Amino acid sequence: MAGRVKWVTDIEKSVLINNFEKRGWIQVTENEDWNFYWMSVQTIRNVFSVETGYRLSDDQIVNHFPNHYELTRKDLMVKNIKRYRKELEKEGSPLAEKDENGKYLYLDFVPVTYMLPADYNLFVEEFRKSPSSTWIMKPCGKAQGKGIFLINKLSQIKKWSRDSKTSSFVSQSTKEAYVISVYINNPLLIGGRKFDLRLYVLVSTYRPLRCYMYKLGFCRFCTVKYTPSTSELDNMFVHLTNVAIQKHGEDYNHIHGGKWTVNNLRLYLESTRGREVTSKLFDEIHWIIVQSLKAVAPVMNNDKHCFECYGYDIIIDDKLKPWLIEVNASPSLTSSTANDRILKYNLINDTLNIAVPNGEIPDCKWNKSPPKEVLGNYEILYDEELAQGDGAERELRNRPGQPVGPRAGRSRDSGRSVLTTWK
């Protein structure tokens, strides 16, 4: 039956096509009857647009949710997380607890961020509280480090404004929306270099939320040693880890591509910081990923024809606190090294094993919850049905003195939540 699956893609990457061909699937065009379409975010917009009026049949599935941008657009991700915090606060959830300075104890995992031009005055007010801070500015809808720059003076933004006297922000080239965030200027360094984590997370359904973590993530390193010096603010080889930028650096290594496996990072941290501290760090990373998904779940169009593999970008500071930087809807499938090619081939293979019933035609009624033995390098990160089914959340949430936050422990293998007291 596997040979009957008809596939289409508008992303010509060998790691995709080789996986489809290995399964004996048949390539067709988008105008023919197809069962599986691995598409770009531009195409998914057209497929689900009101104008197109395209209706997917039960034997058709696609690799994006219709409004994935609620998570993957930088401004909307922050907006949804802020809304989620306020909702938990209204409900009196222990997760929304704050310290004496009004800072969230457990939900402070995204750098302070403002939308421009909308929040320009709020940003200026915050900037003046800490005039020595550095901020990073990013266009909302771009990837691969495009259009990003760092600032440490208000005048650097006013240069972009047609009329700085009005304190309004207007880009000279377009009126494109930007986010501006406090720059994490104390990143954890290895070999003196800044790095971030790229982690892959597969969501098979948002309601109920079920997500999987891919165990083979990696670290991306800058090619130039880090310095917070203001003289290097414009040097993106110091500050941005994106391979699309670093590969143009003089010191870029084409053999390892400036990458480390997450397992190597874990071993390094265990040897330098200790096993307990390292385990706590990774528990916190898993916890904030699930919180970000819970933040967008209510607004996500949970179309049964969809699944999505996200690329999460996490930065760890020198106090071993993880920060969610952004989420990518189409993490790069370009292979920069031999190891990269193997990793991404296996990522697609394991993703297909969850999205499509084994040896069968795609079926939107399939719950995308296969037995553990076919998960490959994925492991269940959170399963809302199992978490609610055992009744543990409500009981633990009501117990006085019950620990909350990412330190409270997890049970990923059972499919229960990373945090025992989650909402």
From Swiss-Prot:
Residues 390-423 are annotated as: Disordered. Mg(2+) 1 binds at residues 313, 326. Its EC number is 6.3.2.-. It catalyses: (L-glutamyl)(n)-gamma-L-glutamyl-L-glutamyl-[protein] + L-glutamate + ATP = (L-glutamyl)(n+1)-gamma-L-glutamyl-L-glutamyl-[protein] + ADP + phosphate + H(+). ATP binds at residues 138, 144-145, 181-184, 194-196, 241-242. A protein binds at residue 144. Its main location: cytoplasm. InterPro entries: TTL/TTLL_fam. Keywords: ATP-binding, Cell projection, Cilium, Cytoplasm, Cytoskeleton, Flagellum, Ligase, Magnesium, Metal-binding, Microtubule, Nucleotide-binding. Mg(2+) 2 binds at residues 326, 328. It comes from the Eukaryota. One of its GO terms (molecular function) is tubulin-glutamic acid ligase activity. The record marks 144 as: Essential for specifying alpha-elongation versus initiation step of the polyglutamylase activity. Highly expressed in brain, heart and kidney. Expressed in liver, lung, muscle, spleen, testis and trachea. In the brain, expressed in ependymal cilia, cortex, corpus callosum and striatum. Expressed in blastomere. L-glutamate binds at residues 220, 259, 344. GO terms for cellular component: ciliary basal body; cytosol; extracellular region; microtubule; motile cilium. It is found in: Cytoplasm, Cytoskeleton; Cytoplasm, Cytoskeleton, Cilium basal body; Cytoplasm, Cytoskeleton, Cilium axoneme; Cell projection, Cilium, Flagellum. Belongs to the tubulin polyglutamylase family. Part of the neuronal tubulin polyglutamylase complex which contains TPGS1, TPGS2, TTLL1, LRRC49 and NICN1. Interacts with PCM1, CSTPP1 and LRRC49. Catalytic subunit of a polyglutamylase complex which modifies tubulin, generating side chains of glutamate on the gamma-carboxyl group of specific glutamate residues within the C-terminal tail of tubulin. Probably involved in the side-chain elongation step of the polyglutamylation reaction rather than the initiation step. Modifies both alpha- and beta-tubulins with a preference for the alpha-tail. Gln-144 is the main determinant for regioselectivity, which segregates between initiases and elongases in all tubulin--tyrosine ligase family. A glutamine residue at this position is found in elongases TTLL6, TTLL9, TTLL11, TTLL13, TTLL10 and favors glutamate-chain elongation, whereas an arginine residue is found in initiases TTLL2, TTLL4, TTLL5, TTLL3, TTLL8 and favors initiation. This is Polyglutamylase complex subunit TTLL1. It comes from Mus musculus. The lineage of its organism: Eukaryota, Metazoa, Chordata, Craniata, Vertebrata. The gene is Ttll1.
